[in-house]
Amino acid sequence: MKVIEGVLRLKGNEKIAVINGRFNHIITDRLVEGARDAFKRHGGNEDNLDLILVPGAFEIPFALEKALSSGKYDAVCCVGAVIRGATPHFDYISAEATKGIATVGLKYGKPVSNGVLTTDTIEQAIERAGSKVGNKGAEAMVTIIEMLDLYNEMGK
């Protein structure tokens, strides 16, 4: 059986965007740094990494649609943080952001990762933004790198 699998490698010419929902920026700034660091550690040329800022997680799918429709990017890494509050707002925002990211990624057939945190507390978000549980922004970028290699391996 032939196994087709992406590996963690960049050639250095891949153009990747990170879309950051700025709401909860104390958390999302760390996610962006994690993504940037992972991109550089795996051979990415920082001149080929763009940061697109949007107000919050709900706006990420719109920016993702614009980024992918431009034809400028090989892949897009989405990061943000939605923290549960006392109202159902969390449920609506997290569901729509997740659905929107998946829908747009499939529409354009390009690698897209969802590094949007959905946590019950700010402490959980901090832990996932580089404290105790690693950095989910870095993990989202590593996912993009592997999927981009798989995408290329499968012949686009």
Curated annotation (Swiss-Prot):
GO cellular component, one term: cytosol
InterPro entries hit by this protein: LS, LS/RS, LS/RS_sf
Active site per UniProt: H89 (proton donor)
Residues that coordinate or bind (2S)-2-hydroxy-3-oxobutyl phosphate: A86, T87, R128
EC class (word): transferase
Keywords (A to Z) from UniProt: Riboflavin biosynthesis, Transferase
Pfam families according to UniProt: DMRL_synthase
Pathway listed: Cofactor biosynthesis; riboflavin biosynthesis; riboflavin from 2-hydroxy-3-oxobutyl phosphate and 5-amino-6-(D-ribitylamino)uracil: step 1/2
Residues bound to 5-amino-6-(D-ribitylamino)uracil: F23, A57, F58, E59, A81, V82, I83, N114
E.C. code: 2.5.1.78
One BP annotation, GO: riboflavin biosynthetic process
Gene Ontology terms, MF aspect: 6,7-dimethyl-8-ribityllumazine synthase activity
Recorded catalytic activity of this chain's protein: (2S)-2-hydroxy-3-oxobutyl phosphate + 5-amino-6-(D-ribitylamino)uracil = 6,7-dimethyl-8-(1-D-ribityl)lumazine + phosphate + 2 H2O + H(+)
HAMAP family: Lumazine_synth
Summary of the function given for this chain in its UniProt record: Catalyzes the formation of 6,7-dimethyl-8-ribityllumazine by condensation of 5-amino-6-(D-ribitylamino)uracil with 3,4-dihydroxy-2-butanone 4-phosphate. This is the penultimate step in the biosynthesis of riboflavin.
Protein family per UniProt: Belongs to the DMRL synthase family.
Protein name (database record): 6,7-dimethyl-8-ribityllumazine synthase
Native source species: Aliarcobacter butzleri (strain RM4018)
